[in-house]
């Protein structure tokens, strides 16, 4: 696996859980002997939904809700087979979406 890299993209609604997961991944990769760059914070997506408070009238009374999706990027350069095995065994919280590209 020389001159290869693993790119891991993490997404979550809660940034604290996301940062904990990123630290776990970085720590595991460094322990197995790989070079790690990251976690790199990517721009946060913000989805805003506007809803009328009243059912029939009062259009001026509105409520806004937002959903923020936080993202991080981790690059693992020159991973060893031990690194890949350790990452596969790693348990992360259910609120974190993980996308891995080899």
Swiss-Prot record:
Listed SUPFAM superfamilies: Ribosomal protein S10
Pfam family, one: Ribosomal_S10
InterPro entries hit by this protein: Ribosomal_uS10, Ribosomal_uS10_CS, Ribosomal_uS10_dom, Ribosomal_uS10_dom_sf
Gene3D superfamilies, A to Z: Ribosomal protein S10 domain
Keyword terms: Ribonucleoprotein, Ribosomal protein
SMART domains: Ribosomal_S10 (SM01403)
Superkingdom, taxonomy of origin: Bacteria
GO molecular function, one term: structural constituent of ribosome
A single Gene Ontology CC term: ribosome
UniProt-listed GO biological process terms: translation
Protein purpose: Involved in the binding of tRNA to the ribosomes.
Family: Belongs to the universal ribosomal protein uS10 family.
Protein name: Small ribosomal subunit protein uS10
Origin species: Exiguobacterium sibiricum (strain DSM 17290 / CCUG 55495 / CIP 109462 / JCM 13490 / 255-15)
Name of the coding gene: rpsJ
């Amino acid at each position: 696996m020389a001159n290869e890299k693993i790119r891991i993209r993490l997404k979550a609604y809660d940034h604290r859980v996301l940062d904990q997961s990123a630290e776990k991944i970085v720590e595991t990769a460094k322990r197995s002997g790989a070079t790690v760059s990251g976690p790199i914070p990517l721009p946060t997506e913000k989805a805003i939904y506007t809803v009328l408070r009243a059912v029939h009238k009062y259009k001026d009374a509105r409520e806004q809700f937002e959903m923020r999706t936080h993202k991080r990027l981790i690059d693992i350069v020159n991973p060893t087979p031990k690194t890949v095995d350790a990452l596969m065994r790693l348990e992360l919280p259910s609120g974190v979406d993980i996308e891995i590209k080899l």
